[in-house]
UniProtKB/Swiss-Prot annotation:
Compartment(s) of residence: Plastid, Chloroplast
This protein's UniProt keywords: Amino-acid biosynthesis, ATP-binding, Chloroplast, Cysteine biosynthesis, Kinase, Nucleotide-binding, Plastid, Transferase, Transit peptide
GO molecular function: adenylylsulfate kinase activity; ATP binding
Alphabetical list of SUPFAM superfamilies matching this protein: P-loop containing nucleoside triphosphate hydrolases
Lineage: Eukaryota, Viridiplantae, Streptophyta, Embryophyta, Tracheophyta
Family that this chain belongs to: Belongs to the APS kinase family.
Any one biological process term the GO annotation gives: sulfate assimilation
Matching Pfam families: APS_kinase (PF01583)
Pathway(s) this gene product operates in, as recorded in its UniProt entry: Sulfur metabolism; hydrogen sulfide biosynthesis; sulfite from sulfate: step 2/3
Gene Ontology cellular-component terms listed: chloroplast; plastid
Transit peptide: 1-59
Catalytically driven reaction(s): adenosine 5'-phosphosulfate + ATP = 3'-phosphoadenylyl sulfate + ADP + H(+)
Record's protein name: Adenylyl-sulfate kinase 2, chloroplastic
Organism: Arabidopsis thaliana (Mouse-ear cress)
């Protein structure tokens, strides 16, 4: 027998603790479990508990003597009081940024490239993921280190708790933007490929990085072309009313105004090939010095 788990079931047990508001009598606020090592419980007590149907240990004590707690444990008291007032949702305080002994320029020198974020945005079916893969491969062949954050892939892990509601979409973009920023700081060329329909969300991600390190790539493909491709069958479902809030159908897509690269669909197979589009992005990165240490 390794230990004993005792369940507390909100009994009407009243208690007082010397120095912590002895006159305050309150019920335990919630059910809970108290796990004790078997060695710390006398054999007779273990037998008593095992045979009892009405044993109710105290699960918690609600302390009301804040003055005494504050006097004796000021730091702990402040944390407890803040957590109580804000249900644990208050932004963390008393945190300090720790500088690294290796700076971004050191990592970029090692990799012989400069970190940045290539943010590919456009309608579903515009070819974002395809171009992202082509770009990653082309840069890899040049000896450059990249990492791709695909919108669908990220929702399998980091953002699996998010839906497609407007506020969740904003949080989805925010998280990906923060992760992309970390990759860029390492010196990696981070390729983010996702619809990201709202300008304010894309601009918020841009503001996370130094000027020039956010390269917005707009897949300028007409809706009718994207809908004719419909690789996932989502447009068909949206038209049938089975998907609500689908970008381009019953939710807007806000095209970039001053993006760095526009990949426009012209109908010409050669100029619209994923490889050629990737080369257009690489030309921009090359001209801006991102492919050099």
């Amino acid at each position: 027998m390794e230990g004993l788990a005792i369940r507390a079931s909100r009994p009407s047990v009243f208690c007082s603790i010397p120095g912590l508001g002895g006159d305050s009598h309150r019920k335990p606020p919630s059910d809970g479990f108290l796990k004790l090592p078997a060695s710390s419980i006398p054999a007779d007590s273990r037998k008593l508990v095992a045979n009892s149907t009405s044993f109710h240990p105290i699960s918690a004590v609600n302390v009301s003597a804040q003055a005494s707690l504050t006097a004796d444990f000021p730091a702990l008291s402040e944390t407890i009081l803040k957590e109580g007032r804000n249900n644990g949702k208050e932004k963390a305080e008393n945190i300090v940024w720790h500088e690294s002994s290796i700076c971004r320029c050191d990592r970029q020198q090692l990799l012989q490239q400069k970190g940045c974020v290539v943010w590919i945005t456009g309608l579903s079916g515009s070819g974002k993921s395809t171009v992202a893969c082509a770009l990653s491969k082309a840069l890899f062949e040049r000896g450059k280190l990249t990492y791709t954050l695909d919108g669908d892939n990220v929702r399998h892990g980091l953002n699996r708790d998010l839906t497609f509601k407007a506020e969740h979409r904003t949080e989805n973009i925010r998280r990906i933007g923060e992760v992309a920023k970390l990759f860029a700081d390492v010196g990696v060329i981070c390729i983010a490929s996702l619809i990201s329909p709202y300008r304010r969300d894309r601009d918020a991600c841009r503001s996370l990085l130094p000027d020039g390190d956010f390269v917005e790539v707009f897949m300028d493909v007409p809706l009718h072309v994207c809908e004719s491709r419909d690789p996932k069958g989502l447009y068909k479902l949206a038209r049938a009313g089975k998907i609500k809030g689908f970008t381009g159908i019953d939710d807007p897509y806000e095209a970039p105004v001053n993006c760095e690269v526009v990949l426009k669909h012209t109908g010409d197979d050669e100029s619209c090939s994923p490889r050629q589009m990737a080369e257009n992005i690489i030309s921009y990165l090359q001209n801006k010095g991102y492919l050099e240490g």
